[in-house]
């Protein structure tokens, strides 16, 4: 029996001279990221410490900045900032005013070493303590954008599947969970017993998740409206109905269908209004389709040449036709475009290394770079602004974890870990925007 739990979810100008100053120095092959220190000029209670702690964590979870926190003491005026001892390139100075019970005004100022003026300042008014993490992520987005010129992703969400009792014959519990990007504020939005939930994927407007599941002994593709919890079955073909993903405009989905009980699956595009299908592939086992950011092509996995690899097909071709992405790749699965369409991130099984890692394929020069070094890394999903990749890592004991890595492979951190083999974490999908 399915139980639905409804989920309700609750500045872009550039400063050219600031960005010109923000250049990472390269010393002996190591990129030195600009250091940001977060301090407060008045520690009124624990609330400032909690907010600043989250800001520091956010500014360490990216490829362009690093941060630390010196809230153990107060800075009364910007002239008193001990730049020499801080060794910081920038300071984020926060001031908290307790307006009333559990309600604050927060002022944020960005300061630069050897500069006596504020670079940027913003004020957030009437913030309730219950919004502590949301406020911190919002401040982090503001700081990140002002210091890098790129949009922050700290108010984005992750959807993923948690399976309890995965090896039991009966009583397996599948939960579709939505959390903040860093794993906090988890909400179960769909719960099913003995009917798997697989490969969730967001619509571009963030309103729907499409996924595959079983019901009544047959496989189908479903949409979940996040705000209401409404589930709609949209396919009912015999055999395999799997790996759905939305087109950028939300009018179509790409999916894998066997159209019967054959040993082959093919990629189709379904018009969500008419339910009309367009076939994209014609032979082999084809699965895990993803649209390009412009919606003009689909990247997917196929074994048509004897082993799984990545192929690309045009959505506008009159007849099914596709080509292998690169002969440099030995075996590959689960491809995803980066938001700018310049790279493809995938699960890589190289002939030179054991196990599977997450890798990045550069479409311009054809280079392949592993960005993780685990033995069983899978299911990559790219952040909406392209800086980070979330994925599943499984250790030698079979315990799974939801982890994150920067696209350059430099910054790794854990989001959630299954602390025993009786729980599996699967199929992460990154939301397309901040909420």
UniProtKB/Swiss-Prot annotation:
Annotated signal sequence range: 1-20
Alphabetic keyword roster: Cell cycle, Cell division, Periplasm, Signal
Annotated compartments: Periplasm
Principal location class: periplasm
Keyword check for Cell division: yes
GO process annotations (BP): cell division; protein import
Gene3D superfamilies linked to this entry: TolB, C-terminal domain, TolB, N-terminal domain
GO CC term, one of those recorded: periplasmic space
Keyword Cell cycle: yes
Function: Part of the Tol-Pal system, which plays a role in outer membrane invagination during cell division and is important for maintaining outer membrane integrity.
Subunit structure: The Tol-Pal system is composed of five core proteins: the inner membrane proteins TolA, TolQ and TolR, the periplasmic protein TolB and the outer membrane protein Pal. They form a network linking the inner and outer membranes and the peptidoglycan layer.
Entry similarity comment: Belongs to the TolB family.
Name of protein: Tol-Pal system protein TolB
């Amino acid at each position: 029996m399915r139980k639905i739990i409804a989920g309700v979810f609750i500045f872009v100008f550039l400063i050219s001279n600031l960005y010109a100053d923000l250049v990472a120095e390269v010393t002996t092959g190591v990129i030195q990221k600009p250091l940001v220190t977060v301090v407060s000029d008045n520690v009124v209670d624990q609330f400032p410490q909690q907010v600043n702690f989250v800001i520091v964590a956010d500014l360490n979870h990216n490829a362009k900045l690093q941060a630390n926190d010196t809230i153990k003491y107060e800075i009364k005026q910007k002239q008193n900032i001990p730049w020499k001892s801080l060794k910081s390139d920038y300071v984020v100075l926060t001031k908290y005013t307790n307006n009333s019970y559990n309600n604050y005004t927060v002022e944020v100022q960005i300061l630069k070493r050897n500069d006596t003026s504020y670079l940027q300042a913003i004020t957030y008014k009437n913030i309730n303590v219950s919004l502590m993490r949301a406020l911190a992520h919002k401040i982090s987005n503001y700081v990140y954008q002002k210091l890098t010129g790129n949009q922050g992703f700290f108010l984005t969400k992750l959807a993923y599947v948690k399976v309890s009792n995965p090896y039991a014959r009966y009583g397996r519990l599948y939960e579709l969970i939505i959390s903040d990007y860093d794993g906090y504020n988890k909400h179960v939005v769909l719960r099913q017993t003995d009917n798997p939930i697989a490969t969730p994927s967001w619509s571009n407007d963030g309103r729907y998740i499409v996924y595959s599941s079983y019901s009544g002994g047959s496989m189908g593709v479903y949409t979940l409206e996040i705000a209401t919890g409404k589930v709609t079955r949209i396919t009912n073909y015999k055999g395999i109905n799997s790996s759905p993903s939305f087109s950028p405009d939300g009018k179509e989905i790409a999916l894998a269908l066997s159209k019967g009980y054959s040993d082959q699956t093919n990629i189709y595009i379904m018009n969500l209004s008419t339910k009309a299908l367009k076939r994209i592939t014609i032979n082999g086992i084809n699965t895990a389709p993803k649209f390009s950011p412009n919606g003009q092509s689909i990247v997917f996995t196929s074994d048509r040449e004897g082993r799984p690899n990545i192929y690309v097909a045009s959505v506008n071709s009159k007849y099914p036709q596709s080509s292998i992405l690169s002969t440099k790749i030995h075996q590959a699965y689960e491809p995803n475009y980066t938001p700018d369409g310049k790279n493809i991130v995938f699960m890589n099984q190289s002939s030179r290394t054991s196990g599977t890692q997450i890798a990045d394929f550069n479409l311009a020069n054809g280079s392949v770079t592993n960005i993780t070094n685990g033995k069983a890394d899978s299911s990559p999903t790219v952040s909406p602004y392209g800086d980070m990749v979330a994925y599943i890592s499984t250790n030698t004991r079979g315990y799974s974890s939801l982890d994150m890595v920067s696209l350059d492979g430099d910054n790794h951190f854990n989001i959630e870990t299954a602390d025993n083999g009786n729980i599996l974490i699967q199929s992460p999908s990154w939301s397309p925007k901040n909420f």
